[in-house]
């Protein structure tokens, strides 16, 4: 009995699936929320729960239903207490000899008797403290009166003289009114904004309909035992039909699209068959705890539990993860398959006080007496501090640099904040605490509108542009209309999958799904299709299209993509570690790339097919601290307390430094020469000026929507721009006053450009928004054609000259047909590298590559050839022609060319400044040419010296 009660609702250690069913017990369990809003203690909701195995319970919402504030305590004959929870489950607390109570194993509750005064009399009630330190207060009759969270925020339940619930008052004072019928059923819920939810029941006390504030209705049907047999959504579609066996377990579910899943129960197992026929077997012990799962692909998941009824280990194809817990049931350690362990500590309020990652780095947290977090300290010792008002709302946050952001509130709603730069943002809300307006520091206002159910129906931008949405009964967007009146429409199947979308020009894309609602076909406006196939685990195994052919995907037992075969039949094979990190990838020509990682999964080294490698190191906060490139050059990085990059240094001693304002906008960049570029911003964070190393300043201005409207350079030359309400650039005036104007179609494609002289270029697009035609007043008409992948297959210029293009399955251009009819042919290797090119005159050039993709040999049918060698960074070291003549190249560790030795022995050498600019070139005859630059990098002089 005790086990059965605990298994209602979200049964501990049970599996759930389909619409949904507790796969360990066969219980049909469903949650539906009738109202939600932001509150001082988080999200407040009125949520109903249904249990098909709980129809003997007759609650405020009828048989089998419960809701999150319909909780109670009942004293049993032996003194134990039965706790009815809001999800329909119940737990029994044993009473000890000292009068205390003990919660069932695996549940973190503290239940104690308390005395209270009511109408001048002393009574004994109870307080139940949960894992979040929220206290549920019950009166002498076991009726729930208050819920007080860890910060003291109280939700109050009021009852009439007959103990019928009459209202619920949230911590901020919002009231949800409750009306009950003569049977004690809730018949109406009144919302703070005046909206109403109404409920109807049949003669047996079953809830048969719920009508939301929009006036749309859900409907429910039951069998003679009050087990729900079906329910309809607000669109009138029957979302699910349930069939039960004699023991009240769901044995079949049929959804709105006629997909059918079945459930077969054994002595200690359940076998499910999904809509596509895939079978999964769930095994459980005598407490209905899942012990193993056999998946359709033959892999398994095994679970074990400790003596306190907590999950102790979980073993999948990827390996085993184990858990330990503290005395209050909090996870204390997690140990991975690779032996690495993460650990956690908590305070007496079960608040996390430290988290030590798999790399050994620790983040710590501290709290005030009310449980508010007052500091969080990163592994490097940097701390963020927080302060709170008397309602436990965070009123300031100070980062590691000492920069403070402050916040103001009205009840639970943040009405404004002032950032570290002193810029103020403001917000307003409706009666349901939904954000209605946002005002930026410049005074620009954006706003939202909602329907009675709280669905967003329109957004108004700061420039007045309105985007509007139309929704169906369940909240799917069926149409969106932009600020210029262009409308896109959408359709859905009965299970809420999008089946089509039609753009403002009438072009339609469509989608088809299998019985498990996996997309199996997508068709664009031209009728081009992509089809998909899936394995029994729901992973894509095949993707097909007439132009790219068929792509294949294979997975290892852990679900990692181990083999990918492209449309040309070329395969890439990968290997993974127990954490799912790729260790090695072998491409279709045999090149192998290897990867290494640190304990947090950051990539620490890549070794390429030619043996070169690039490595990275990270600090204990997970930030890139050092990298060594293929030539051994080392770059180090440092950060400020807000994680902004403040310096970058290489091993030659060069350093770049950066500064930031209090909100993270970059204020300056200083290069190794000492040259500094500075930036300024408006209060909204838009860049308004940049001053280069020479002191030259460019300025910028923006419209209310944040679009750049003017750009003025250091010489005073100004470019101005205007935009439509969709943010499309509609005119641009250059520094000479010449204005170009642009127009657009409903999809946002530019349809015309008119220059200052009145010359117009018109553009036309096909149904998939590819440029189809340009008409230039001076150059005439050019047309374009495309394949299903958007590759250009034909271009005909204004003179009628047509160029045709052919591609292989991977989009490599294999031939070009010239207007003369001549062809240029290209061939590629298995990884898309060009290996052969034949031009219209019959010249054939072949190419070969090394493991890093560098060209190492090219030769033509005229006897010409060239061979190349490279360093690890891909710089050419030698170049040898068909006669054996070799040119050699020498570089420094930063990849800068120092010396070029020609085949005849002549040498050209190069010198550089600290900014990698060439400062001198000495040719083979000893002539030296020097160069100077300004601070920005513009060349100031070139001096040719006499022979040294």
Segments (PLM) and residue ranges:
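Extended charged/polar low-complexity repeat regions
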Residues: 46, 52-948
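Intrinsically disordered, low-complexity segments enriched in small residues
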Residues: 1-60, 118-120
């Amino acid at each position: 009995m005790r086990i059965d009660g605990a298994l209602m609702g979200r049964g501990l250690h049970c599996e759930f699936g389909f619409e949904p069913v507790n796969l360990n017990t066969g219980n049909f369990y469903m949650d539906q929320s009738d109202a939600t809003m932001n509150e001082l203690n988080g999200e407040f909701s009125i949520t109903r729960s249904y249990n098909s195995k709980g129809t003997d319970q007759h609650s405020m919402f009828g048989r089998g239903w419960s809701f999150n504030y319909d909780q109670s305590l009942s004293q049993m004959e032996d003194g134990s207490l039965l706790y009815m929870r809001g999800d329909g489950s119940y737990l029994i607390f044993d009473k000890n000899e000292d009068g205390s109570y003990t919660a069932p194993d695996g549940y973190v509750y503290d239940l104690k008797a308390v005395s209270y005064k009511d109408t001048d009399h002393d009574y004994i009630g109870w307080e139940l403290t949960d894992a979040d330190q929220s206290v549920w207060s019950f009166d002498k009759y076991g009726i729930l009166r208050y819920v007080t969270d860890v910060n003291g925020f109280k939700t109050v339940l009021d009852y009439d003289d007959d103990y019928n619930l009459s209202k619920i008052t949230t911590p901020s004072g919002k009231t949800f009114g409750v009306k009950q019928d003569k049977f004690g059923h809730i018949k109406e819920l009144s919302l703070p904004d005046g909206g109403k939810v109404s409920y109807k029941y049949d003669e047996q006390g079953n809830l048969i309909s719920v009508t939301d504030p929009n006036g749309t209705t859900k409907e429910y049907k039951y069998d003679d035992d009050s087990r729900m047999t079906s329910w309809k959504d607000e669109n009138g579609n029957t979302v699910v039909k349930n069939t039960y066996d004699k023991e009240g377990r769901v044995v079949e579910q049929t959804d709105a699209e006629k997909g059918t899943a079945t459930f077969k129960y054994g002595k200690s197992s359940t076998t499910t068959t999904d809509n596509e026929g895939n079978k999964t077997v769930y095994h459980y012990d005598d407490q209905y705890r899942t012990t193993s799962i056999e998946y359709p692909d033959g892999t398994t998941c095994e679970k074990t539990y400790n003596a306190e009824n907590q999950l102790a280990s979980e073993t999948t194809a990827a390996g085993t993860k184990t858990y330990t817990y503290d005395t209050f049931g909090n996870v204390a350690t997690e140990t991975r398959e690779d032996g690495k362990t993460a650990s956690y500590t908590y305070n007496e309020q079960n608040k996390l006080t430290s988290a030590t990652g798999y790399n050994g780095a620790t983040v710590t947290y501290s709290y005030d007496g009310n449980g508010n977090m007052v500091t969080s300290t990163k592994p490097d010792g940097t701390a963020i501090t927080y302060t709170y008002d008397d309602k436990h709302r965070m009123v300031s946050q100070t980062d590691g640099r000492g920069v403070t952001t402050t916040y103001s509130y009205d009840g639970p709603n943040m009405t404004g904040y002032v950032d570290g730069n002193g810029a103020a943002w403001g917000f307003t809300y409706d009666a349901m605490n939904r954000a209605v307006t946002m005002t930026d520091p410049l005074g620009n206002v954006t706003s939202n509108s909602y329907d009675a159910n709280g669905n967003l129906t329109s957004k108004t931008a700061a420039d007045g542009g309105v985007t509007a949405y139309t929704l169906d009964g369940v909240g799917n967007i069926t149409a969106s209309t932009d600020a210029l009146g262009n409308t896109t429409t959408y359709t859905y199947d009965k299970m809420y999958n999008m089946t089509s979308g039609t753009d403002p020009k009438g072009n339609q894309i469509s989608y088809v799904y299998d019985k498990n609602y996996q997309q199996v076909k997508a068709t664009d406006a031209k009728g081009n299709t992509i089809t998909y196939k899936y394995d029994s685990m729901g992973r894509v195994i095949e993707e097909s299209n007439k132009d790219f052919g068929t792509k294949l995907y294979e997975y290892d037992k852990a679900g990692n993509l181990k083999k990918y075969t492209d449309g040309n039949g070329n395969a890439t094979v990968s290997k993974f570690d127990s954490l799912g990190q790729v260790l090695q990838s072998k491409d279709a020509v045999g090149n192998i790339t290897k990867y290494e990682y640190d304990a947090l999964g950051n990539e620490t080294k890549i070794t390429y097919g030619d043996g070169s490698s690039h490595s990275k190191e990270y600090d204990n906060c997970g930030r890139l601290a050092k990298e060594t490139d293929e030539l051994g050059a080392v770059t180090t990085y440092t950060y400020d307390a807000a994680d902004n990059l403040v310096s970058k240094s290489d091993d030659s001693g060069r350093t770049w430094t950066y500064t930031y304002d209090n909100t993270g906008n970059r204020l300056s960049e200083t290069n190794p020469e000492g040259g500094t570029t500075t930036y300024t911003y408006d209060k909204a964070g838009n860049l308004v000026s940049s001053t280069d190393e020479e002191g030259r300043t460019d300025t910028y201005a923006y419209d209310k929507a944040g679009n750049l409207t003017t750009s003025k350079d250091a010489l005073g030359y100004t470019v101005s721009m205007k935009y439509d309400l969709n943010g499309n650039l509609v005119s641009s005036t250059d520094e000479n006053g010449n204005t170009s104007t642009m127009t657009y179609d409903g999809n946002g494609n530019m349809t015309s450009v008119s220059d200052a002289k009145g010359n117009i270029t018109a553009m036309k697009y096909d149904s998939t928004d590819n440029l189809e035609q340009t008409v230039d007043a001076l150059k005439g008409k050019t047309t374009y054609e495309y394949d299903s992948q958007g590759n250009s297959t034909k271009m005909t210029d204004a003179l009628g000259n047509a160029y045709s293009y052919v591609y292989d399955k991977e989009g490599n251009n294999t031939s070009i047909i010239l207007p003369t009819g001549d062809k240029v042919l290209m061939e590629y290797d298995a990884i898309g590298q060009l290996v052969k090119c034949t031009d219209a005159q019959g010249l054939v050039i072949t190419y070969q590559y090394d493991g890093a993709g560098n060209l190492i040999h090219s030769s033509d049918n005229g006897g010409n050839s060239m061979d190349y060698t490279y360093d690890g960074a891909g710089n050419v070291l030698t170049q040898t022609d068909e006669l054996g003549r070799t040119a050699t190249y020498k570089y420094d560790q930063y990849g800068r060319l120092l010396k070029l030795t020609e085949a005849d022995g002549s040498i050209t050498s190069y010198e550089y400044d600290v900014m990698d600019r060439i400062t001198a070139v000495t040719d083979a005859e000893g002539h030296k040419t020097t160069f100077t630059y300004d601070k920005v990098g513009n060349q100031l002089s070139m001096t040719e010296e006499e022979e040294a």
